[in-house]
Amino acid sequence: MKTYGFVRGTMIAMACVAGFAATASLASPFGGAIQPRDLRCEYRVDPLGIDVVEPRLSWTLQSGQRGQVQTAYRILVAGDPKQLAGETGDLWDSGKVASDQSIQVPYAGAPLTSGMACYWKVQVWDKNGKPSAWSRPACWTMGFVGRDSWKAQWIGFDASRNRDPSGRKLDLSGAQWIWLPGENARNAAPVATRYFRREFTVPEDRDLASAVCAVAADNGFTMFLNGQQVCTGGSFKEAVTADLAKHVRKGANVVAIEAQNVGDGANPAGVLAMLVVRFKTGKPETIVTDGQWRSSDIAAAGWTDAGFNAEGWRNAEALGAEGIGPWGKVTVGPAELFLPPAQFLRKEFNVEKPVQRATVYASALGNYELHLNGRQVGDAYFAPGWTDYDVRVYYNTFDVTNQLKKGFNTLGGILADGWYSGHIGWGRLRDHYGKDTRFSAQLTIEYTDGSSETILTDKTWTAATGPILEGDFLMGETYDARKEMPGWSTPDFDDAAWKPVDVTDKLAIAIESYPSVLVRKFQEIKPLSVTPTKDGACIYDMGTNFAGFVRLKVQGAEPGRKIVLRFAERLNPDGTIYTTNLRGARAVDTYLCRGDGKEVWQPRFTFHGFQYVEVTGYPGTPGLDAITGIELTSDTPVVGRFACSDAMTNTLYHNVCQTQRANFIEVPTDCPQRDERLGWMGDAQIYVRTATFNTDVSAFFTKWMVDVEDAQLENGGFSDVSPRKVANGGGTAAWGDAGVICPWTIYTVYGDTRILARHYDAMQKWIDYCKGTTKGTLLRPAEGYGDWLSIKADTPKDVLATAYFAHSTRLVAQTAAVLGKVDDARTYHQLFEQIRDAFNKAYVSADGRVKGDTQTVYVLALAFDLLPKEKRPMAAQHLVDNIRDRDWHLSTGFVGTKDLMATLNAIGRTDVAYHLFHNETFPSWGFSIQHGATSIWERWDGWTPEKGFQDPGMNSFAHYSFGAVCEWMFRTIGGIDTQLAPTEAGGPAYKHIVIRPQMGG
């Protein structure tokens, strides 16, 4: 039996640092006195430029005396730090307020206006009525109060973004699905790898203009041209496109495709491809998959090369044209990527008087990096953040008082595509919100004489392109150091060759202060090893799977030397990097050397999900110090840590945290590596409670819930992803329910009633939408994603959808009660009871068996309180029996896994939960760890010894949904809970904390 020794001090510190509890019991330098600390405004420390006119103030408490509590507080807010030091609150003096409230205290002082600086501190009284010392002072500043306050114009350099007219789109006309003959490929081909090749000739007298391809496969493929790998993919719905021009040669050529059919058993398989070679004159050469291709089930040496002896290979079987079943229509993105350079924008201005305070407010349609007098402003990445730019855009606020100087100054911005016009999601699609990026900034200078001046983006700015040739989240960044412009954001720089900017006067959308935490560097990661490859490259193992990029160091390179960095989460059996699961994401960074000694470079406008880095083109033999990993994540403060005596459990916790950081980049995404990286709603609601144990995600989810409501459909259905991706679906059970579950979770953890009030109407619309889909039965239809990626356990979609309909309805009833909407609370509670009755009549038999008889149906029925009291023990036994019949293994997918372990606890079978937790055989958390996982896999069988890699169309190795078990780890192993019993609520925001570890194993 394994035992767990939780680090108790760390456990309690988590609760206190997060500001959840009004009590404190840690030893501290304050002795027996109680002391307020960690002051925050709107969830953040000293936030700049907020636009909340009644901001909420919070603090934590520390005392060396067990059982201490706050009994009263006094808050002072002043417009000047000197006044605050004199204990004068000219903006607000709350007076002594008898209350134990230490979070979400609303400001109730003088009206706040644009640009105002507010300094504040707090004093509290303990259980004996003894006052504390005043806290250290904190501050916040106001941004723009009022929608018409933004005066700056929106500028860009459109000439840098001219589309290449040669970028044609392929339509796969004439191509046919092919496979090895005689394998019944349209229905049930064996799980195996097959090989296909086709030779073609380029006449010696024709000059090449371009060569492009589009390839789709069921399930995955790697394509070669003349022996060189040119692209990989893993989807039959979206074709991967690639530029092949540098690989085509005059004379004999061969295109070769290695295709994999994966799955638990025989299933459809096929390859569909088109290659178009265009010449400077005359007709193009088009090669399509058809019966003339040669095929084999054996890959002999040299099979991808021209001149290979294909004796013994057979003609492929043509299965039918593009559009046939079971594959249907295939989406094809642009044949040639459009990756414009970053734009450099600048403006000189003169400061003639002493400066009191200087503040920059900056925004963009795209991503920007702000510079002033030769230095970057701030340390964040990907500002101003991701929104639905058809609805709103955020601005960020920076204090630049110390960067200004008397005389001439220069304000500059670097502008890249970002989420606005860069590649988002699958299909290599871009320009989701617009084609032309824009930058906007207002610099407000307040002088010591009381006067002020504002520098705005307008037509007087100038623009150019520079060393950043490409900057795209999915495709990577290309940087030519020979094109650097030293001093471009300083007054001494000569910008005579720069061009006038293009100007957009105003935007017809909301411009608001950024309410979340920006993306920043979390840590630097040193590689563990570097291994040379047979083709002259080197592969670095960073030791863990993370999101970010690498900093490159090189010395002694000649000017123009190209160093290429490719990124992957795993290695192939032959030691090469596994990139097939990236699908359409190129994920390549390229550095062209300056050639003047030591050079250091890192990207600005891209990130990747990876553990391995392939480096080619490096001069000489690179050492371990040639690259350093830079891990990025949204700057959600760490509030929880977990450690115990079991190595596997500690590794699992590391993997959970690693995956959370990798996917909490601006929004809660599904994965950081492939051509997706979207704010999938189902994943977010499954994981949000776990996230709160690890980091303070209050501001992060406050912002994202605005994205969720912005993406809500007119019929009340929530989008499957938020922010909205153009032409994406919605209204899906367990995914759309995030619009109810996430704000409720933020309320329960942080005591935030405003998030409930703000999104209450949207929550009601969701319930109305769900009810409308039932057509009077209160049973939702069998549609949606179901229990995504379960293991041979097909949970009926109508059961799952109806269970979630009931659950969300109950949460809306509870929300209404919190908001004081008594009639609404009664109405929704009655609706919940009606849905529960319908659920039982339709899906639950007399012996407590639920339709589908999967682990997930029992988890949902029990966790959501859908069963009558007499049937709960029966259903509980069915759940345990199902687990036993699978040799004590789980079969749940995303949805079922979320509540599986807590449900076992609730029915008194914590022993079974520990059994599942300890498993190291498939499927289990331990299985992936046994096979080298350093993050949470998307699939239980992302890789197995028997089958290798799973379907590359859906095979992320950094996907946090199954990491939701971490909530159970904190509640059960760590024993941190807010309930005295499974059915008894402990109040929001850790008003009452129960420390009760449940041992097992």
Language-model regions, residue ranges each:
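Active-site acid/base region of carbohydrate-active enzymes
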Residues: 366-367, 456-465, 612, 621-655, ...
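Bacterial N-terminal signal peptides
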Residues: 10-21
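Active-site-adjacent structural elements in folded domains
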Residues: 239-242, 344, 381, 427-428, ...
